[in-house]
A protein has these predicted regions:
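Short hydrophobic segments within beta-strands
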Residues: 106-109, 149, 207
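N-terminal secretory targeting modules
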Residues: 1-108, 113-121, 132, 136-143, ...
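Alpha-helical cap/lid subdomain in secreted, periplasmic
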Residues: 7, 98-101, 125-145, 152-154, ...
Length: 266
Protein backbone atom coordinates (compact mmCIF):
# COMPACT_ATOMS: atom_id res chain seq x y z
CA UNK A 1 0.00 0.00 0.00
CA UNK A 2 1.19 3.51 -0.82
CA UNK A 3 0.43 5.95 1.98
CA UNK A 4 0.90 9.68 2.39
CA UNK A 5 -0.48 12.48 4.54
CA UNK A 6 -2.45 15.39 3.10
CA UNK A 7 -2.66 18.83 4.67
CA UNK A 8 -6.13 19.72 3.43
CA UNK A 9 -5.04 23.23 2.48
CA UNK A 10 -6.05 22.96 -1.16
CA UNK A 11 -2.48 22.49 -2.42
CA UNK A 12 -1.68 19.68 -4.85
CA UNK A 13 0.30 16.78 -3.45
CA UNK A 14 2.02 14.64 -6.09
CA UNK A 15 2.97 11.01 -5.55
CA UNK A 16 5.51 9.68 -8.04
CA UNK A 17 4.81 5.99 -8.54
CA UNK A 18 8.32 5.48 -9.86
CA UNK A 19 9.65 6.25 -6.38
CA UNK A 20 8.06 3.10 -4.96
CA UNK A 21 9.02 -0.55 -5.22
CA UNK A 22 6.29 -2.50 -6.97
CA UNK A 23 5.56 -6.21 -6.73
CA UNK A 24 4.02 -8.43 -9.40
CA UNK A 25 0.62 -7.92 -7.79
CA UNK A 26 0.90 -4.13 -7.98
CA UNK A 27 0.90 -3.69 -11.74
CA UNK A 28 -2.59 -2.14 -11.65
CA UNK A 29 -3.35 0.65 -9.15
CA UNK A 30 -6.35 -0.30 -7.03
CA UNK A 31 -8.56 1.48 -4.54
CA UNK A 32 -7.82 5.03 -3.45
CA UNK A 33 -8.95 5.58 0.12
CA UNK A 34 -9.01 8.72 2.25
CA UNK A 35 -8.92 8.36 6.05
CA UNK A 36 -9.98 11.46 7.95
CA UNK A 37 -8.40 12.62 11.18
CA UNK A 38 -11.60 11.98 13.13
CA UNK A 39 -14.83 10.00 12.62
CA UNK A 40 -17.70 11.74 10.80
CA UNK A 41 -15.37 14.32 9.23
CA UNK A 42 -15.80 14.93 5.52
CA UNK A 43 -13.73 16.55 2.82
CA UNK A 44 -13.56 17.04 -0.93
CA UNK A 45 -10.64 15.74 -2.97
CA UNK A 46 -9.74 15.66 -6.65
CA UNK A 47 -7.53 12.84 -7.93
CA UNK A 48 -5.52 13.30 -11.12
CA UNK A 49 -3.24 10.88 -12.93
CA UNK A 50 -0.31 12.33 -14.87
CA UNK A 51 1.43 10.37 -17.64
CA UNK A 52 5.16 10.48 -18.21
CA UNK A 53 6.39 11.71 -21.58
CA UNK A 54 5.84 9.19 -24.34
CA UNK A 55 2.74 7.60 -22.78
CA UNK A 56 -0.83 8.10 -23.92
CA UNK A 57 -4.23 7.24 -22.49
CA UNK A 58 -7.56 6.50 -24.20
CA UNK A 59 -9.87 9.44 -24.59
CA UNK A 60 -12.17 9.68 -21.60
CA UNK A 61 -15.79 8.94 -22.43
CA UNK A 62 -18.11 11.29 -20.60
CA UNK A 63 -20.72 9.55 -18.47
CA UNK A 64 -24.29 10.55 -19.14
CA UNK A 65 -26.60 11.24 -16.24
CA UNK A 66 -28.72 8.26 -15.21
CA UNK A 67 -32.24 8.65 -16.58
CA UNK A 68 -34.45 6.97 -13.98
CA UNK A 69 -37.55 7.58 -16.11
CA UNK A 70 -36.28 5.79 -19.22
CA UNK A 71 -37.59 2.47 -20.50
CA UNK A 72 -34.06 1.03 -20.31
CA UNK A 73 -33.82 1.94 -16.63
CA UNK A 74 -37.19 0.32 -15.88
CA UNK A 75 -36.10 -2.83 -17.72
CA UNK A 76 -32.91 -2.90 -15.67
CA UNK A 77 -34.86 -2.59 -12.41
CA UNK A 78 -37.19 -5.43 -13.42
CA UNK A 79 -34.21 -7.79 -13.42
CA UNK A 80 -33.77 -7.20 -9.69
CA UNK A 81 -36.69 -9.49 -8.85
CA UNK A 82 -34.86 -12.75 -8.30
CA UNK A 83 -37.88 -14.54 -6.85
CA UNK A 84 -41.44 -13.28 -6.38
CA UNK A 85 -42.22 -15.86 -3.74
CA UNK A 86 -45.37 -15.98 -1.66
CA UNK A 87 -46.58 -12.39 -1.39
CA UNK A 88 -49.51 -13.04 0.95
CA UNK A 89 -47.89 -11.37 3.98
CA UNK A 90 -46.77 -8.37 1.95
CA UNK A 91 -50.27 -7.93 0.54
CA UNK A 92 -51.72 -8.04 4.05
CA UNK A 93 -49.33 -5.26 5.10
CA UNK A 94 -50.36 -3.18 2.09
CA UNK A 95 -54.03 -3.71 2.92
CA UNK A 96 -53.39 -2.53 6.50
CA UNK A 97 -51.64 0.60 5.25
CA UNK A 98 -54.43 1.43 2.82
CA UNK A 99 -56.98 0.96 5.59
CA UNK A 100 -55.18 3.55 7.69
CA UNK A 101 -53.89 1.04 10.23
CA UNK A 102 -50.35 1.31 11.61
CA UNK A 103 -47.73 -0.54 9.55
CA UNK A 104 -44.03 -0.85 10.36
CA UNK A 105 -41.26 -1.48 7.84
CA UNK A 106 -38.02 -2.79 9.35
CA UNK A 107 -34.59 -3.26 7.79
CA UNK A 108 -31.81 -5.35 9.31
CA UNK A 109 -28.38 -5.88 7.82
CA UNK A 110 -24.84 -4.59 7.52
CA UNK A 111 -23.24 -1.38 6.33
CA UNK A 112 -25.38 -1.06 3.19
CA UNK A 113 -28.53 -1.09 5.31
CA UNK A 114 -26.81 1.35 7.66
CA UNK A 115 -26.39 3.66 4.68
CA UNK A 116 -22.64 3.59 3.97
CA UNK A 117 -21.99 5.44 0.73
CA UNK A 118 -25.19 7.48 0.94
CA UNK A 119 -25.01 11.21 1.63
CA UNK A 120 -26.69 12.08 3.90
CA UNK A 121 -26.64 8.60 5.36
CA UNK A 122 -30.05 8.68 7.05
CA UNK A 123 -32.19 9.91 4.17
CA UNK A 124 -30.38 8.74 1.02
CA UNK A 125 -29.91 5.09 2.02
CA UNK A 126 -31.95 2.44 0.21
CA UNK A 127 -33.87 1.61 3.39
CA UNK A 128 -35.27 5.10 3.93
CA UNK A 129 -35.95 5.70 0.24
CA UNK A 130 -37.89 2.44 -0.14
CA UNK A 131 -39.81 3.21 3.05
CA UNK A 132 -40.71 6.63 1.64
CA UNK A 133 -41.87 5.03 -1.61
CA UNK A 134 -44.04 2.51 0.26
CA UNK A 135 -45.54 5.31 2.34
CA UNK A 136 -46.29 7.47 -0.70
CA UNK A 137 -48.05 4.63 -2.48
CA UNK A 138 -49.99 2.91 0.26
CA UNK A 139 -50.32 5.07 3.38
CA UNK A 140 -53.65 6.77 4.05
CA UNK A 141 -52.26 9.03 6.74
CA UNK A 142 -49.00 9.14 8.68
CA UNK A 143 -49.49 5.49 9.61
CA UNK A 144 -46.31 3.86 8.26
CA UNK A 145 -43.34 3.61 10.64
CA UNK A 146 -39.67 3.03 9.85
CA UNK A 147 -37.10 0.96 11.76
CA UNK A 148 -33.52 0.73 10.49
CA UNK A 149 -31.13 -1.73 12.16
CA UNK A 150 -28.05 -1.69 9.96
CA UNK A 151 -24.58 -2.00 11.50
CA UNK A 152 -21.46 -2.25 9.34
CA UNK A 153 -19.41 -5.44 9.43
CA UNK A 154 -21.96 -7.52 11.34
CA UNK A 155 -22.94 -11.06 10.27
CA UNK A 156 -26.38 -12.56 10.74
CA UNK A 157 -25.10 -14.23 13.93
CA UNK A 158 -25.08 -10.81 15.54
CA UNK A 159 -28.23 -10.01 13.62
CA UNK A 160 -30.01 -12.66 15.67
CA UNK A 161 -29.17 -10.70 18.82
CA UNK A 162 -29.70 -7.28 17.30
CA UNK A 163 -33.11 -8.17 15.93
CA UNK A 164 -34.56 -8.30 19.43
CA UNK A 165 -32.63 -5.24 20.58
CA UNK A 166 -32.82 -2.99 17.52
CA UNK A 167 -35.94 -4.07 15.63
CA UNK A 168 -38.35 -5.22 18.33
CA UNK A 169 -37.40 -2.38 20.66
CA UNK A 170 -40.18 -0.50 22.40
CA UNK A 171 -42.67 -3.21 21.49
CA UNK A 172 -42.35 -2.75 17.73
CA UNK A 173 -44.11 -5.38 15.62
CA UNK A 174 -42.82 -4.95 12.05
CA UNK A 175 -45.14 -6.00 9.23
CA UNK A 176 -42.37 -6.26 6.63
CA UNK A 177 -38.72 -7.05 7.39
CA UNK A 178 -35.99 -6.63 4.76
CA UNK A 179 -32.91 -8.77 5.50
CA UNK A 180 -29.58 -7.74 3.94
CA UNK A 181 -26.33 -9.39 5.01
CA UNK A 182 -23.17 -9.64 2.91
CA UNK A 183 -21.58 -12.24 5.20
CA UNK A 184 -22.35 -15.95 4.93
CA UNK A 185 -22.75 -17.83 8.20
CA UNK A 186 -24.83 -20.53 9.81
CA UNK A 187 -27.26 -18.10 11.45
CA UNK A 188 -28.73 -16.66 8.25
CA UNK A 189 -31.52 -19.23 8.01
CA UNK A 190 -32.05 -19.07 11.77
CA UNK A 191 -32.64 -15.33 11.55
CA UNK A 192 -35.12 -15.78 8.71
CA UNK A 193 -37.00 -18.47 10.62
CA UNK A 194 -37.02 -16.34 13.78
CA UNK A 195 -38.76 -13.53 11.91
CA UNK A 196 -41.21 -15.77 10.06
CA UNK A 197 -42.30 -17.48 13.30
CA UNK A 198 -43.26 -14.26 15.09
CA UNK A 199 -46.86 -14.29 16.33
CA UNK A 200 -48.06 -11.49 14.02
CA UNK A 201 -46.69 -13.17 10.83
CA UNK A 202 -44.48 -10.46 9.30
CA UNK A 203 -43.36 -10.65 5.67
CA UNK A 204 -39.66 -11.24 4.98
CA UNK A 205 -37.83 -9.92 1.92
CA UNK A 206 -34.24 -10.99 1.20
CA UNK A 207 -31.95 -8.41 -0.41
CA UNK A 208 -28.62 -9.37 -1.99
CA UNK A 209 -26.20 -6.52 -2.59
CA UNK A 210 -23.08 -6.77 -4.79
CA UNK A 211 -19.43 -5.75 -4.49
CA UNK A 212 -17.39 -3.92 -7.12
CA UNK A 213 -15.79 -7.21 -8.19
CA UNK A 214 -19.28 -8.35 -9.31
CA UNK A 215 -19.52 -10.90 -6.47
CA UNK A 216 -22.11 -11.51 -3.80
CA UNK A 217 -23.55 -14.34 -1.73
CA UNK A 218 -26.86 -14.90 -3.46
CA UNK A 219 -25.86 -18.35 -4.79
CA UNK A 220 -25.21 -19.50 -1.21
CA UNK A 221 -28.05 -17.70 0.53
CA UNK A 222 -30.88 -17.79 -2.02
CA UNK A 223 -31.68 -21.48 -1.27
CA UNK A 224 -32.96 -20.22 2.10
CA UNK A 225 -35.34 -17.89 0.31
CA UNK A 226 -36.50 -20.60 -2.06
CA UNK A 227 -37.02 -23.01 0.83
CA UNK A 228 -39.44 -20.59 2.50
CA UNK A 229 -40.76 -19.16 -0.80
CA UNK A 230 -39.68 -15.61 0.05
CA UNK A 231 -39.46 -12.57 -2.22
CA UNK A 232 -35.80 -12.01 -3.13
CA UNK A 233 -34.17 -8.96 -4.72
CA UNK A 234 -30.74 -9.13 -6.39
CA UNK A 235 -28.72 -5.98 -6.98
CA UNK A 236 -26.16 -8.12 -8.80
CA UNK A 237 -28.70 -9.28 -11.38
CA UNK A 238 -29.75 -5.66 -11.82
CA UNK A 239 -26.51 -3.80 -12.45
CA UNK A 240 -23.58 -6.11 -13.25
CA UNK A 241 -24.65 -6.56 -16.87
CA UNK A 242 -24.53 -2.78 -17.24
CA UNK A 243 -20.88 -2.49 -16.31
CA UNK A 244 -19.57 -4.00 -19.58
CA UNK A 245 -21.89 -2.09 -21.91
CA UNK A 246 -20.97 0.89 -24.03
CA UNK A 247 -23.23 3.93 -24.45
CA UNK A 248 -24.49 2.68 -27.83
CA UNK A 249 -25.32 -0.74 -26.38
CA UNK A 250 -28.12 0.37 -24.09
CA UNK A 251 -26.02 1.27 -21.08
CA UNK A 252 -28.01 2.85 -18.27
CA UNK A 253 -25.25 3.46 -15.71
CA UNK A 254 -21.56 2.76 -15.23
CA UNK A 255 -19.78 1.01 -12.40
CA UNK A 256 -18.28 4.35 -11.42
CA UNK A 257 -21.75 5.87 -11.13
CA UNK A 258 -23.13 2.98 -9.09
CA UNK A 259 -20.39 2.40 -6.52
CA UNK A 260 -19.22 4.70 -3.76
CA UNK A 261 -16.32 2.35 -2.98
CA UNK A 262 -15.49 -1.34 -3.41
CA UNK A 263 -18.38 -2.48 -1.22
CA UNK A 264 -21.10 0.17 -1.10
CA UNK A 265 -23.39 1.77 -3.68
CA UNK A 266 -23.50 5.54 -3.93
Amino acid sequence: NLRCSLTGDGMERRIYLSDYTWTEDDYIPGQIKFIMSAPEKMGKASVRFYLNDGYTAPEEVEEEAVDTKSELYCTMIERSLMNLGNTYRIRKAIEKARAGKEVTLAYIGGSITQGAGATPINTECYAYKSYQLFKSRFAMRDNVKFVKAGVGGTPSELGMLRFDRDVLRDGEKPDIVVVEFAVNDDCYESLVRKILKLDWNPAVVLLFSVFANDWNLQDRLSPVGRLYDLPMVSIKDTVVEQFTKKPNEGRVLTKNQFFYDMFHPS
